[in-house]
Amino acid sequence: MEGGPEQLHLGKALEEAGGGRALAEIQELALKWFMETQAPSILQNGVLPPWFHGFITRKQTEQLLRDKALGSFLIRLSDRAVGYILSYRGSDRCRHFVINQLRNRRYLVSGDTLSHSTLDELLRHYQEVQLEPFGETLAAACPRLEENDLYDAINTGLQHTNLSLKIPATEFPSMLPDKATSPRLPAKPQVSFLHKKALDMSSRSVSDEVSAEVPTRVPPIPRRSPSLLDESPAGPSDVIYTDLRKINRAQLGLGTEVWGTLRPASAGSLACSPGREPSGKLSDEDQNKPNSLGPAPSGMKPDQGSTMPYTSLGFSLPPSSETLGSQATTWRQGFLKLSHEAQSSSEASSTDTYHLVETPGLQQEARDRPDQRGSPYEQIPTCWHGTAKLSYPGVSPTYSQQSGPMDYGYEKISGTSKLPEPGNTYEQIPAAKNKDTGRVHKPDKFRRLFFTDKKHKF
């Protein structure tokens, strides 16, 4: 026996799909076949007959017919093929027969030779004729499960039915009136199996679209805590370690520069000759003076020696209100005045001989006067990198004392074993180098003597 053209076409499609085709796809094909070819002929005044149950499984069918009378039957759509299944309650068990549709659109029970034009005609036939080889006949149709006295309804425009009217009454049990106290309401249309299938498919598609449209909510990013360096220290205990390191580095660099300015003077000056101790101790009066420099050499006045600042002997200068430029100018004038006074009083002082420290300005003057070989004052060379050279050979060094710091600027010394702690936190800025400094800044005393002699001459 051969099925109808539509049934054969769908059967070939299922065979081409193979066993890998999902059950949902098979049911979709069967539903499409039923809606396009079978629904118009099955509907009775727009309503499905009570014996048609749509898509239910074999197990559900047996559970439904278990408590029914002998011969109770129903027709359902196959869940594994395109076609109908006839199920009825036999004497010992439930029996299932496949109903095929022929090319001439007639229905035939598998194993029989007699075909029928409609399913309703087929059922009436087997209510009178026994099904072979069991010898059993059909009795009454097994009704579908009704929900709250609602009946199924279907029409040809099923796909255009308003879905908003299909609201199950079981969702609102409190709103239903009591059957005993109130008159029975007119019956409402029940959602058929076709409506349910269409609703299920539409709800799946709508839920997929909604789930695709709704963005995934991302949890908010936790607020970042403020950094320690962004907060200003509120008290003396809130010390930031990076700032502390910067201060230590700045103090270390300042100490290195100060030690570099004092290193050359300490290497070449303040050196005593063997067998002689440095003469001159600070008296009580000199110690009480803030600007005292210690014992002045013989032939010098106290006010002349007091013009030298502390830095001439390598001591740190305490902070004052004067500007750094004026301090540097005063230091150079005092240094030149001390050097010229020492040269003028060389004959009067014979006990203590002082050596002049070599500077660029005095070195030029010493070259102009080469006849100072027999003078008790001699030039002491500056120590550069641990080597000392005498500008006038043949002169034995006696007692030397530093008259002032050399005008060499800053010199960085690497490899110092121990850095001294400077007593003054202010950085000393030396005066700018000038080759003609010694000649431009003449002492006021010689200038007065020079003009006085000219007056007397004229």
Curated annotation (Swiss-Prot):
Domain SH2 residues, every copy: 51-142
User: For the region Disordered, what residue ranges are annotated?
Assistant: 204-235, 267-326
Highest taxon, organism lineage: Eukaryota
Keywords per UniProt? SH2 domain
Q: Where is the composition biased (Polar residues)?
A: 304-326
Q: Where is the composition biased (Basic and acidic residues)?
A: 278-288
InterPro entries reported for this sequence:
SH2, SH2_dom_sf, SH2D7_SH2
The record's annotation in Pfam families points to: SH2 (PF00017)
**Protein's name according to its UniProt entry:** SH2 domain-containing protein 7
Q: Which organism is it from?
A: Mus musculus (Mouse)
